């Protein structure tokens, strides 16, 4: 019989190894299912042998019970801020000061991307993670140990000869995780986070560690200390050691032998910053030698041996000269500010979104006001706030009729957007075609704004289905269209006929039906015809389809013009059927589960994956077709409904037993 302590330790070693490969090196060696199997075997053993549970176990990453507040902790040595260099001249001044203070001695720099997140120190004893503290005021921070434990790229144990040490680094949220988080908050009716930095800071300081665990934070290290002092004689050596110990270190960091090399590094990443998976706001430049750092010393607030080269601000102040209204593919009217041109983050900006009428009212904004404009990535710039009211300000009023087709606009109760309800509005048609042809939908390369404008304005295309009737000669007389480019567009249109039913559903532009919902509808019904005939109640049996989505689908197919459009697309040989079969033979085949509350060890997503891998189905709402409700702490109305419908309620432990076929 196996010694459980030995098996537990072996499982922990395996899981730590695979977490490092996946979350730090991005080089996984096993599948998610294999990782889950190891994790759940460890959870099973720790449940049976609670005396063997330790804080550094991978199972403890999911987060513990909510806290009442954060304890203040004094840092082993101050986490100082850095002086800033805002241009090349200031960076060269820094270099001159360093050379003067070092008396002409040879030295080199290390350059690191300045990641835009929340600074945090993590402490280890005998290779095991023990404590995490935010930067705070630089002298004292907040104990966020339980929240930090949920960050997968922060190792809970490392192999090292150092008996006790501290790492310092930046807690960040990737652009992708940020977009997912805001999309999720939109669906729940919650306010959006302004930027990834705010999202990372708010996530790390959650009173409920399980919320932090769901936010996909990452931790990049840049300092290694023992007893509050650098552990190695060069900064580059310390970064190398951190990598070898299993910490995530930004792989863009470089040693530089001169200030010209430093400036070249800064210029390169300023041009590439929008292509990075995370946000940066500059470059940190450090003298590499720790001995030379000591000689250079500190000012009252910052080290003399390091500086932050800040990229141009992505906020600027300018004046609103007017407000236009744009019409989207769903008919939503969006007010857009016409700005006095201003450079924001190196790009000249003359327009910025105002989102909707409520946002204008919230900002207290009028034409003629001075406003702060922010630009982030490829997203259209937005107005953040009014900085000063104009002397001759003029209030904006949303038009009562569509600015393109003059149809009376409608604003439904509970909605922020006003809408043009004319399905034949030229502006709506243009946006619908662009959506239909976009990457990730029907992916018709070459179908851009300029071509779509001409197709609609010259009345060559009256609806989406007309695209499949186009011939090369229809495009030949259009601006910037030759035989070759016209042929490419026609070939790409033809190739799009092979796209799957979920893509076709997404392309139709039905309200609330995005890529994910389209997949669930295709899986549940198998064909466009079945979806078109389905009732609101029947549609809600599909995974993650609630009343709002179901009603939108039924409403779409109730409109004769939409049914005619779908019929024409069917005749154009688009894919209207979908072959999908759920995993068969699993222990949960035929059962539908609903998850509610906070589970002890599994996140919602982890539980969902396990159920589906075992052949089961996870629904978002409790109904008569629900087989089991898996309830954790703080279960809400779903638990009450389960009791009302006499549906069996089970714990996470019972779910694990069912997964094992018991």
From Swiss-Prot:
Q: Where is the active site?
A: 114 (n6-amp-lysine intermediate)
| One Pfam family recorded for the sequence | BRCT
Known cofactor(s): Mg(2+); Mn(2+)
Q: What class of enzyme is it?
A: ligase
Q: What does this protein do?
A: DNA ligase that catalyzes the formation of phosphodiester linkages between 5'-phosphoryl and 3'-hydroxyl groups in double-stranded DNA using NAD as a coenzyme and as the energy source for the reaction. It is essential for DNA replication and repair of damaged DNA.
According to its UniProt record, the EC number is 6.5.1.2
Q: Reaction catalysed by this chain?
A: NAD(+) + (deoxyribonucleotide)n-3'-hydroxyl + 5'-phospho-(deoxyribonucleotide)m = (deoxyribonucleotide)n+m + AMP + beta-nicotinamide D-nucleotide
Q: What is this protein called?
A: DNA ligase
Residues annotated as binding Zn(2+) are 402, 405, 420, 425
Alphabetized NCBIfam families for the sequence: dnlj, PRK07956.1
Identify the residues that bind NAD(+): 32-36, 81-82, 112, 135, 170, 286, 310
Q: Name the InterPro entries for this protein.
A: BRCT_dom, BRCT_dom_sf, DisA/LigA_HHH, DNA_ligase, DNA_ligase_AS, DNA_ligase_CS, DNAligase_adenylation, DNAligase_N
